[in-house]
From Swiss-Prot:
Pyridoxal 5'-phosphate binds at G25, T26, G27, G28, T29, S113. The keyword Amino-acid biosynthesis applies. Its cofactor is pyridoxal 5'-phosphate. GO terms for molecular function: cysteine synthase activity. Coiled coil: none annotated. Disulfide bonds: none annotated. The lineage of its organism: Bacteria, Bacillati, Bacillota, Bacilli, Bacillales. This is Cysteine synthase.
Length: 155
């Protein structure tokens, strides 16, 4: 509400944003930025990203997953559930595959939760179609994963 949302509005001055996606850990980014963006762009779709293996926001049961920082296993008090319009669930494997792909193809060293955000944003962009602007936040840096299986390449 105080930092990320206003910064996005400033950076996108004069442009339309059709969807904003953020992973839900504490819910702070989605709630705060989502509020600011809904005020500026009344038709924007705000999308929560949660682990497929722990779909608590969707009404499912909590479970173990690999999307560090997302899916605490409960709905945090800091999450304004009225802000988001939809939820995209992302699996462990596709989040990791996406992180690896953007590292190899785009030079973006992203962590697992960032891989989840990128995957969800691509899904939403395909759904909305050509000419729409989809924005997400990459919450994790891949540097902390360099010694893990995420960035252990065989090829």
């Amino acid at each position: 509400e105080l930092t990320t949302g206003p910064e996005i509005v400033e950076q996108f001055e004069g442009k339309q944003i059709d969807a904003f996606l953020a992973g839900v850990g504490t819910g702070g980014t989605l709630s705060g930025a989502g509020k600011v963006l809904k005020e500026k762009y009344p038709n924007i779709e705000i999308v929560a990203i949660e682990p497929e293996a722990s779909p608590v926001l969707s009404g499912g049961e909590p479970g173990p997953h690999k999307l560090q920082g997302l899916g605490a296993g409960f709905v945090p008090d800091t999450l304004n559930t009225d802000i988001y319009d939809s939820i995209i669930q992302v699996g462990n494997d596709i989040a990791m595959e996406t992180s690896r792909r953007v590292a190899k193809e785009e030079g973006i060293l992203a962590g697992i939760s960032s891989g989840a955000a990128i995957h969800a944003a691509i899904q939403k962009a395909k759904e909305l179609g050509k000419g729409k602007t989809v924005l997400t936040v990459l919450p994790s840096n891949g540097e902390r994963y360099l010694s893990t299986p995420l960035y252990s390449f065989d090829d």
